[in-house]
Amino acid sequence: MPSVQRLVAAGLLLAVTVVGCSAPSSQSSGDKGQSTRKVPDKPSKPVSLEILDVAGNLQLTQGMIDEFQKTHPEIVSKVSYSKAPAPELAGKIKAQQQAGRVQIDMVLTGTDGLAAGLEQDLWADMSTHQDAIGNPDYLPPAAEMAKLAQGKGTAVVYYPSGPLFEYDPAKVPNPPKSPQQLLDWAKAHPKRFQYADPANSGPGRTWLMGLPYLLGDKDPSDPEKGWDKTWAYLKELDKYVDVYASGTSETMKNLATGQVDMIMSTTGWYINPRALGTVPKKMKAGHFDDMTWVTDAQYAVVPNGVSADKMSAVLNLLHWMLTPEQQAKAYDDGYFYPGPAVKDVPLSMAPAKSQQVVKEYGVPEFDTWIDQFPKKPSLSSQAQVKAFDLWNRQVAGQ
């Protein structure tokens, strides 16, 4: 039976459990009057912003933020950044709100931290400030992901994600075209295929959420009652997997060193590690026939209790970040390929370095695949946590 680290899954599950068990408190979300009191077009004086990243998002957006501060010192005098694991986010924000001292002005988060804050009503209502943010001309799949924020967050980057697989062509001359072919290959080559704990891996999570579409399960949105084929498949595949990696980087290392020959991947995870030299350039990416992309996005949220002046600065910043010129920076080094959440941001608008990385380490067919196959948003975070728990008990723990 494969071993697996369940730390992140446990943390996410605990966060949701705490949410469900917490008694209501009049101070649980700090000053909720933010959405109703007047926010000026610009701060009364330049403000410093404290930005917390729990999603690795700064790799994509810090250039946008830093340029805004340099261009608009009359709005933002200084930006300070910090990072934390997503499972710690809700507790950190709630503690500041209950103390009446909100020190974090904006959070960059994935769906996990977004949902934990929604459950505890930690995030300010951004829908009342839509005129200040503008109306981003989102790509349709990004618009669907934006809805997960329920008006209390702003999608700032997007990518179709996967599921894709990555392999050594010298060891896998005939890559699989279906999950069944992958299972057959794994059976013939035990311990040579690997994916990471879905709770702590984008490729692992996308593989888990993409299988119900590939296998024709009853309800891809319901891991508990609608994934019979997926759970049966993963239990069978489990027989031929040696160890479930604790995170995606571990699978990349194992592929690079020849410990395994095929792993699950995404567009960004295929491009970026090869560009960084941690995975040999010779590795190839593949997709399954008739796949469905399971999309992903990252968000900016503002804690309740932030001052009107700081909210004004954040709104100006978000308006800036969602312009096509700034969105082009999201191509980065392929980390979230493509990256932009809004329409009409071709690679030709990206910085020269980004264009070179994608040209040298990307896959020309990626754009074809993105256009060719349907796209569905990720599960809600609550449903993801249920899926992680079921995977731990029914697959990794069997």
Regions found by a protein language model. Give the residues of each.
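Extracytoplasmic ligand-binding site segments that recognize negatively charged/polar headgroups
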Residues: 54-63, 86-87, 103, 108-250
